[in-house]
């Protein structure tokens, strides 16, 4: 592994990018952090659900019309450091968390938004645990459909099982959730009827996460830190071509 290759600790997000290609990881490290409306909405939901006591300190509700003009500028100055939201945005977020906040497991939590730092194969990792308690680690994921079949698709598409393995692995050293905790995901719908559902991640998925993470770390250790595309994973044939084969599910 090239010295100085690791610019910062790896994370669930960055290792997923590296699994696509080294160029994806470099782009992830280099990109400017741009806060999108979807990200703002997700943060608002997380704060309302997990840390409602921080709402007054971190948010200000703008009751006026267009976000422009002297009146709005004065409001901004009076609320420096706060995220400014509209009443309808707050109202929608409150509807979204109404069902989720009554979840039994969520109400057994002993901590939220825990920063964790640990190592796998001497490679530093960093993460943030949404909520945890004795015997469990929990994560909140917003989605359009929290039904079992639909959320399973999201779970696989976004590789949430990798995050589950990483945080369980961190707990083996840090023990913030006790011995041998289970991993849960609270899926929260962001559109009517705003259902929520708690899912336990199976041992099979945890093992799948472990397998993919360790394979990615083997590749990461081989990487010289220089830009590389899909050829890094030996997928190319002659003349830089990749053959698209029939996937197993179509056979």
Question: Which sequence ranges carry the predicted segments?
Answer:
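Metal-dependent nuclease catalytic cores that hydrolyze phosphodiester bonds in DNA/RNA
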Residues: 1-126, 235-236
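Secondary-structure boundary elements
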Residues: 102-108, 133-139, 172-181
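Coil-to-beta-strand transition motifs
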Residues: 122-126, 133-135, 191-194
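Hydrophobic/aromatic-lined pockets within catalytic cores
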Residues: 49-54, 142-145, 172-176, 221
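Conserved catalytic cores of phosphodiester-cleaving nucleases, focusing on short active-site segments
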Residues: 112, 127-150
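Short helix/strand-bridging catalytic loops that position acidic/His residues to coordinate divalent metals
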Residues: 146-158, 202
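Short, well-structured alpha-helical interface segments that form or flank functional binding sites
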Residues: 40, 126, 159-162, 166, ...
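Metal-dependent nuclease catalytic regions and adjoining charged, substrate-binding loops involved
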Residues: 90, 166-251
């Amino acid at each position: 592994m090239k010295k100085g290759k690791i610019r910062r600790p790896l994370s669930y997000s960055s290792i997923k990018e590296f699994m696509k290609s080294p160029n994806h990881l470099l782009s992830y490290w280099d990109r400017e952090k741009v806060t999108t409306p979807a990200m703002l909405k997700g943060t608002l939901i997380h704060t309302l659900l997990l840390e409602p006591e921080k709402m007054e300190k971190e948010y200000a509700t703008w009751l006026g019309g267009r976000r422009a003009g002297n009146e709005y500028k004065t409001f901004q100055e009076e609320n420096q450091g706060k995220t400014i939201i509209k009443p309808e945005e707050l109202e929608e977020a409150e509807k979204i968390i109404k069902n989720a906040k009554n979840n039994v497991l969520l109400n057994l939590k002993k901590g939220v938004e825990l920063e964790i730092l640990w190592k796998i194969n001497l490679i530093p990792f960093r993460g943030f645990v949404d909520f945890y308690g004795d015997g469990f680690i929990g994560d909140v994921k917003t989605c359009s459909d929290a039904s079992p079949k639909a959320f399973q698709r999201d779970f696989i598409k976004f590789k949430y099982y990798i995050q589950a393995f990483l945080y369980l692995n961190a707990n083996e050293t840090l023990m913030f959730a006790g011995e041998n905790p289970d991993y849960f995901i609270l899926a929260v719908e962001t559109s009517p009827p705003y259902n929520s559902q708690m899912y336990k991640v199976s041992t099979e998925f945890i093992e799948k996460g472990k397998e993919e993470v360790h394979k990615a770390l083997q590749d990461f250790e081989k990487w010289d830190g220089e830009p590389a595309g899909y050829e890094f994973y030996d997928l190319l044939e002659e003349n830089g071509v990749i053959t698209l084969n029939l996937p197993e599910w179509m056979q």
